[in-house]
Amino acid sequence: MAKTLYEKLFDAHVVYEAENETPLLYIDRHLVHEVTSPQAFDGLRAHGRPVRQPGKTFATMDHNVSTQTKDINACGEMARIQMQELIKNCKEFGVELYDLNHPYQGIVHVMGPEQGVTLPGMTIVCGDSHTATHGAFGALAFGIGTSEVEHVLATQTLKQGRAKTMKIEVQGKAAPGITAKDIVLAIIGKTGSAGGTGHVVEFCGEAIRDLSMEGRMTLCNMAIEMGAKAGLVAPDETTFNYVKGRLHAPKGKDFDDAVAYWKTLQTDEGATFDTVVTLQAEEISPQVTWGTNPGQVISVNDNIPDPASFADPVERASAEKALAYMGLKPGIPLIEVAIDKVFIGSCTNSRIEDLRAAAEIAKGRKVAPGVQALVVPGSGPVKAQAEAEGLDKIFIEAGFEWRLPGCSMCLAMNNDRLNPGERCASTSNRNFEGRQGRGGRTHLVSPAMAAAAAVTGHFADIRNIK
């Protein structure tokens, strides 16, 4: 029977499936960070259990860390306790930890792929909703809760029901300057923020195949923002070339054997999906969210929508509430909306290609008066690479702040946050009320669009910036 990529990955990992019971899946990689793991390790300790597969478990610090100093005390008591607990737990249970002083430390979903921990065909879990990022490699990757973190630590397995399948095909080629972030925001604009609920999404089509691995990671990272369980892109030569030579990737003949298997990880001809969505790449322009969920998104050259234009009463009420929170009036051009802060970073857009795209806009320009702009590389290796290329100097000369790796202003769990009423052009993944700080107003954009907002002081079409 013809199978989708998701069905192949799921079926290959079923350890046991009794009739009328939820299947038990084997987990190939478990990524751990300081926020969702302390109680899980306490649970192991209370029952005298070891970590079943410490060699398949990798930990880092990201959510709570300061991006201005490597001092563990910098972000307050709760952050310090969580980081100290992670150090203690990893030492006691034999788990590899990339702590604040480790050169590989960084956002968990940046660290995994760049170290070759993430490989095609794997099941990957983490106590973090944006674990879907790793699906860019043709891996089944999804976020789990803290009780499930404990279960995986103890057994290297997890009970998981089968999801529905969705194909999202982006046909044709994207226009110059249109990024994976624009593509995925356009997709969510079409599906809505709950359009993928109960599904695992496979992204395909020419515009997706044209993306680099970093672009595919941005795409899959935000699958969760349309309500999907996970996002997938079938592995191809782009994938294999990215993986080859990385620290934890197979070497020599093992790599060749792995590639031979990875090439089978494609949706079969004739396989059926529960839901199919199609977009035309050439119709996608630079995207900016205007509301308080990622589906409330428009082209940069559009006007803020009028809630009265929504036929659905729920959407209309949601739009009214969003505009009130965001302090926006219907009908005004988006490019007239001024911003206070810019955040370039997060597990969505903090990799080297993202920083290059932002630096290209920042070069030779200055951050607009009254705007604070942060650039936060996703990991130690990304920061080192950017500095080797001189990107840090471009940003600093333009008036951006060049920070240490971490989750930073994506979420208000550290010192980087918005004050009430502040408006931010952000390359992160969520624009919910209070996500970047109580009363903060978040607009999601690509790295180049964020840099353009920083230097102009308002939203601007990067295609018009010469």
Curated annotation (Swiss-Prot):
Binds 1 [4Fe-4S] cluster per subunit. The keyword DNA damage does not apply. It catalyses: (2R,3S)-3-isopropylmalate = (2S)-2-isopropylmalate. The keyword 4Fe-4S applies. [4Fe-4S] cluster binds at C347, C407, C410. Pathway: Amino-acid biosynthesis; L-leucine biosynthesis; L-leucine from 3-methyl-2-oxobutanoate: step 2/4. Its EC number is 4.2.1.33. One of its GO terms (biological process) is L-leucine biosynthetic process. It is an enzyme of class 4 (lyase). This is 3-isopropylmalate dehydratase large subunit. The lineage of its organism: Bacteria, Pseudomonadati, Pseudomonadota, Gammaproteobacteria, Enterobacterales.
